[in-house]
Amino acid sequence: MAQLYFYYSAMNAGKSTALLQSSYNYQERGMRTVVYTAEIDDRFGAGKVSSRIGLSSPAKLFNQNSSLFDEIRAEHEQQAIHCVLVDECQFLTRQQVYELSEVVDQLDIPVLCYGLRTDFRGELFIGSQYLLAWSDKLVELKTICFCGRKASMVLRLDQAGRPYNEGEQVVIGGNERYVSVCRKHYKEALQVGSLTAIQERHRHD
């Protein structure tokens, strides 16, 4: 039986690398995969999933209006799909998560979703909220804070490198705008108003 998987983490935990490896594993066995990524995130070029270690794959784009079940069913009828993989799945809508569950339940195609659990305010993304609620399997991909603890929070930094937790939920950026940290140092950085000061303090402890 196919299942719906949600692989979640903070930033820079290797989600895209894990997705590309999973896709490769299917293809190596002669199976066909379809990869989706969010239209909104084009840091590495539109229409592809890229990892920080240099791997990449062509990808179909989804936005809030995409009818994923209809798209996948139509393509599956043309040529069998053995696995659907979705990068940046935090940007899915509630309806799209439901449609992906239908891909699993009605078409018997496994769906592997990769994305962030929470935003820079510590709030769940809509896509992540419903994947946490409806997935068959939840898998945390771990990355670490500068202190060595598990990093479960994402700090947003302004142009001067100062952390803040107000404003729009979605501002696309790479390392220059977001940093993964543990909960303790997330709270401390916001209280002090400087991630650098917290890092310096930690080095001297």
Curated annotation (Swiss-Prot):
SUPFAM superfamilies: Glucocorticoid receptor-like (DNA-binding domain), P-loop containing nucleoside triphosphate hydrolases. HAMAP family: Thymidine_kinase. The lineage of its organism: Bacteria, Pseudomonadati, Pseudomonadota, Gammaproteobacteria, Enterobacterales. The keyword Metal-binding applies. This is Thymidine kinase. It comes from Escherichia coli O157:H7. It is found in: Cytoplasm. GO terms for cellular component: cytosol. Phosphorylates both thymidine and deoxyuridine.
